[in-house]
């Protein structure tokens, strides 16, 4: 049995989070309640020297009090292999800085259990991983070829155009067949993004909400429905979407059954998927949100279920 004592959280700085809706805070608060020592560091404090992985960390104490939610000790440099668990929880963009951190953390995983598995996080970008389940998705095009995008829009009518590696609803546009700004939109994307873009058929069901379903070790444990603002195509809570309680439909349960084995095979202990109507649009493996909202609406204590799964995983390890 590999008992957990020390837990490091690689995250955006704790001073900047909104504790009312932050899943990293919920995960960390549950770890603290279980008696683990918490260590906080931001991605830029991660380093490798002579083959060993270090970070400049602060021991962290949390309080569920707005405006007074954390205390940090003096910084110290530690060998991250001395940690039992590390949570990879900084927000995207999924850029080379993010990818580099997965390469470094891969050096100490799984002896130090990194959640989620850093190699598979690197190899499973949210908007690309989901295409492995093409029959569960809306019609989708990934390209930077503007003629292909124009052809796709002519076939689909209304489309959604978004950056391939964005997050939080940033850069998401709804373009109708007769949109006179379409050429300008493609020009803007060409100036802003070096990578291909993703275009998807517009799903009118988004007006009823975009469902975020949370899975722990491949099993659904909670969900919220995110309803977009009246004049916005985006339902992300970062973009003004309104969360509301919900239950899983038979179709959504089927989607979870289909993807569960792939999540477990890749070591994804905590995942959030997005579903509009009958279609899955993303599999979020970097820093899924929604834990506090699920709990607020009377759903499961997802943070507790996640730590149960982590403890089970550690117990199965034999070092």
UniProtKB/Swiss-Prot annotation:
Gene3D superfamilies: 3.40.50.20, ATP-grasp fold, A domain, ATP-grasp fold, B domain. ATP binds at residues 153-209. Keywords: ATP-binding, Glutathione biosynthesis, Ligase, Magnesium, Manganese, Metal-binding, Nucleotide-binding. Pathway: Sulfur metabolism; glutathione biosynthesis; glutathione from L-cysteine and L-glutamate: step 2/2. Pfam families: GSH-S_ATP (PF02955), GSH-S_N (PF02951). PANTHER family: GLUTATHIONE SYNTHETASE, RIBOSOMAL PROTEIN S6 MODIFICATION PROTEIN. This is Glutathione synthetase. Its EC number is 6.3.2.3. It comes from the Bacteria. The keyword Metal-binding applies. The keyword Metal-binding applies. It comes from Agrobacterium fabrum (strain C58 / ATCC 33970). It is an enzyme of class 6 (ligase). Residues 127-311 form the ATP-grasp domain. Belongs to the prokaryotic GSH synthase family. InterPro entries: ATP-grasp (IPR011761), ATP_grasp_subdomain_1 (IPR013815), Glut_synth_pro (IPR006284), GSHS_ATP-bd (IPR004218), GSHS_N (IPR004215), PreATP-grasp_dom_sf (IPR016185). Binds 1 Mg(2+) or Mn(2+) ion per subunit. Its cofactor is Mg(2+); Mn(2+). Mg(2+) binds at residues 282, 284. It catalyses: gamma-L-glutamyl-L-cysteine + glycine + ATP = glutathione + ADP + phosphate + H(+). One of its GO terms (cellular component) is cytoplasm. NCBIfam families: glut_syn (TIGR01380), PRK05246.1 (NF003573). GO terms for molecular function: ATP binding; glutathione synthase activity; metal ion binding.
């Amino acid at each position: 049995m590999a008992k957990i004592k020390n837990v490091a959280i690689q995250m955006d700085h704790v001073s900047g989070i909104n504790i009312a809706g932050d899943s990293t805070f919920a995960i960390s608060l549950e770890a603290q309640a279980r008696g683990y020592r918490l260590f906080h560091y931001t991605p830029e404090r991660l380093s490798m020297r002579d083959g060993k992985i270090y970070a400049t960390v602060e021991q962290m104490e949390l309080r569920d009090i707005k405006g007074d939610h954390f205390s940090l000790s003096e910084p110290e440099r530690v060998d991250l292999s001395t940690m039992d668990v590390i949570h990879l929880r900084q927000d995207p963009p999924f850029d080379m800085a993010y990818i580099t951190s997965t390469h470094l953390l891969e050096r100490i995983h799984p002896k130090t259990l990194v959640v989620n598995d850093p190699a598979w996080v690197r190899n499973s970008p949210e908007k690309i991983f989901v295409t492995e389940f093409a029959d569960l998705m809306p019609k989708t095009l990934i390209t930077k070829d503007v003629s292909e995008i124009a052809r796709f829009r002519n076939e689909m009518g209304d489309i959604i155009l978004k950056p391939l590696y964005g997050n939080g609803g940033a850069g998401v546009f709804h373009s109708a067949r007769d949109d006179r700004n379409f050429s300008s939109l493609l020009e803007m994307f060409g100036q802003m993004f070096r990578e291909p873009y993703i275009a998807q058929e517009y799903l009118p069901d988004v007006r009823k909400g975009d469902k975020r379903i949370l899975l722990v070790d491949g099993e659904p444990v909670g969900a919220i429905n995110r309803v977009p603002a009246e004049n916005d195509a985006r339902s992300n809570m970062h973009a003004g979407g309104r969360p509301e309680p919900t239950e899983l439909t038979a179709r959504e349960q089927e989607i979870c059954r289909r993807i569960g084995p792939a999540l477990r095979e890749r070591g994804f202990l905590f995942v959030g998927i997005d579903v509009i109507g009958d279609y899955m649009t993303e599999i979020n493996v970097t820093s899924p949100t929604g834990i506090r909202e699920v709990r607020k609406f009377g759903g499961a204590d997802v943070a507790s279920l996640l730590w149960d799964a982590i403890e089970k995983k550690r117990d199965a390890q034999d070092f």
